[in-house]
């Protein structure tokens, strides 16, 4: 069970990084001129800040520390919105097959993370 948990944490980390990259790719493909460069950097950084600042206190999948404490449902909604934006970003970047694979990996992660989801919903 511990090995599965470590593998899922690696999958989660990979999905988080891929989500940030996908937002940057979307900005690069979708915008021109000055905005192309600014948004390619700003979008992933803004999402990274939201992801790291809003957390549930004592979350076992994180350090347990937080800057802005939120309840579990709010945290779950933030995660799902970020992943949904990443899937949409890939889709609208003309990477439909990649967006489908990414969505399947996100679903797999949340299926494996059923205990964490239960924990979040009870916070």
UniProtKB/Swiss-Prot annotation:
InterPro entries: DUF2568. The keyword Transmembrane applies. Pfam families: DUF2568. GO terms for cellular component: plasma membrane. The keyword Membrane applies. Keywords: Cell membrane, Membrane, Transmembrane, Transmembrane helix. Its main location: membrane. The chain crosses the membrane at residues 9-31, 38-56, 67-91, 98-114. It is found in: Cell membrane. It is a multi-pass membrane protein. To E.coli YhgE. This is Uncharacterized protein YrdB. It comes from Bacillus subtilis (strain 168). The lineage of its organism: Bacteria, Bacillati, Bacillota, Bacilli, Bacillales.
């Amino acid at each position: 069970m511990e090995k599965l948990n470590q593998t899922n944490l690696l999958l989660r980390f990979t999905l988080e990084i891929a989500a940030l990259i996908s937002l940057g790719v979307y900005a690069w493909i979708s915008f021109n001129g000055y905005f192309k460069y600014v948004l390619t950097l700003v979008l992933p950084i803004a999402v990274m800040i939201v992801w790291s600042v809003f957390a549930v206190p004592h979350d076992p999948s994180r350090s347990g520390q937080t800057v802005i404490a939120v309840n579990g449902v709010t945290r779950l909604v933030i995660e799902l919105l970020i992943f949904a934006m990443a899937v949409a970003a890939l889709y609208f970047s003309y990477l439909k097959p990649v967006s489908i694979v990414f969505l399947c990996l996100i679903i797999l992660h949340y299926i494996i993370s059923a205990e964490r989801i239960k924990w979040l919903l009870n916070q």
